[in-house]
Amino acid sequence: EDDIPEIHRRLDLLEPKGKRFNSEYEVYIFPVPEQKEPMILMREEGVTQIAQELVEELQSISNLKLVCFDPLQAFTTGNVSSSNEAGQLWGSYCANISARLGCTTLTIHHLNKAGLTVDSDDSMVQRTSVRGASSLVDSQRFCLTMALGDVETCERVCEEQRVPYDRMAVVKASLVKSNSGNVDYSTKTLFRKDGVLEPLEELQNASYIYDKF
């Protein structure tokens, strides 16, 4: 959804010291708003020719580890809001990319309006907050949700972290679906630090060590 200037602004916020320019790894971002027309990978009748061409292009990247579509609705005109067939088709397309290229394929999607007010640490309750057809979750190997924490938790965490109150600083994250066994479905509290969400437990441990010295 972002154009090139906004992408660079966000990257500078995440990593202001420019160390990323010395990394041995590459990140490629395709800003859809900069193109002459939308990049539609799936329509109601199926995946598009552009979707197939994209996979061929991705094959030219050596040692590819991650492909991310953000957000889903920017790449499809299929009715993923209510059609389980459309949701399953998207899941199959992502699975095909992973199988052919040996990489992880992530899709970023929004929660429904209720997800903004759900105050529960139950991961199965959080699962119902994912917008659209249930197959969007069911067709994936795993699904994570993130939503703002409640006001009381946010106030407490900001105080503990010694920062001014910021309603957007505290997020509840849950693993709500996984095809693997022996996974942790408990909801985790994350704190936004320097533009990056970090597990609160790790920050608390760091603060404890700092206070001791």
Q: Language-model features: where?
A:
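Conserved inter-motif catalytic segment of the P-loop NTP-binding fold
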Residues: 1-80
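Low-complexity, intrinsically disordered short peptide segments enriched in small/polar/basic residues
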Residues: 3-4, 167, 206
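Phosphate-binding/switch region of NTP-binding enzymes
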Residues: 13, 66, 85-196
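Short, surface-exposed, polar/charged, turn-prone segments marking secondary-structure boundaries
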Residues: 22-27, 95-97, 134-137, 201-206
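Intrinsically disordered, low-complexity segments enriched in small/polar residues
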Residues: 26, 163, 183, 206-208
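Compositionally biased, intrinsically disordered low-complexity regions enriched in proline and serine
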Residues: 29, 94, 186, 209-211
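Residue-identity detector for glutamine
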Residues: 35, 49-52, 59, 73, ...
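DNA transaction DNA-binding modules
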Residues: 196-213
